[in-house]
Amino acid sequence: MKIAIINGPNLNLLGKREVDIYGGESFDTFLSKLKEKYANQEIAYFQSNVEGELINEIQRVGFSYDGIIFNPGGYTHTSVAIGDAIAAITTPVIEVHISNIFGREEFRKLSHVSGKAVGVISGLGLKGYELAIEYFIA
């Protein structure tokens, strides 16, 4: 099974940024553990702070992969274009957020992605990525 993990802006700073909200583990460390646990799956990873690069990656994998795990970061609440890109592809997407976006500031409760995703995992920390993989391989 081919699964793409796509992370949006500032997720490259996990482990350094707001550790009280996002935890102290870097995504690279977490990804290594994830790839080891799911060694029978092909897991690709992409991160960008640039909206257009995220859209390009969604389009690149969106017709050939079995699943996309997508954390759009701050673009969740602002990018109609990312929502449109997800609507345009055939690969199912699970939207993942490390923090509970529905329990934070009011502006974070809007997602331009959720309505196009097959599901949303929010507030379960990095475990949300693992749960998304479990969904795809079930």
Stretches with model-predicted labels:
Residues 44-52:
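Short beta->alpha junction loops
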Residues 44-45, 94, 103-138:
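Short, glycine-/small-residue-rich phosphate/pyrophosphate-handling segment
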Residues 9-11, 73-76, 99-101:
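Short glycine-rich anion-binding loops that position phosphate/pyrophosphate groups of nucleotides
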Residues 1-4:
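Extreme N-terminal starter segment of soluble prokaryotic enzymes
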Residues 14-28:
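Glycine- and acidic-residue-enriched helix-capping/strand-helix junction motifs
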Residues 79-88:
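Short Gly/Thr/Asp-enriched flexible loops that form oxyanion-binding sites at enzyme active sites
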Residues 61-68:
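Short acidic/histidine-rich motifs immediately flanking catalytic phosphotransfer sites
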Residues 53-57:
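Short acidic active-site motifs
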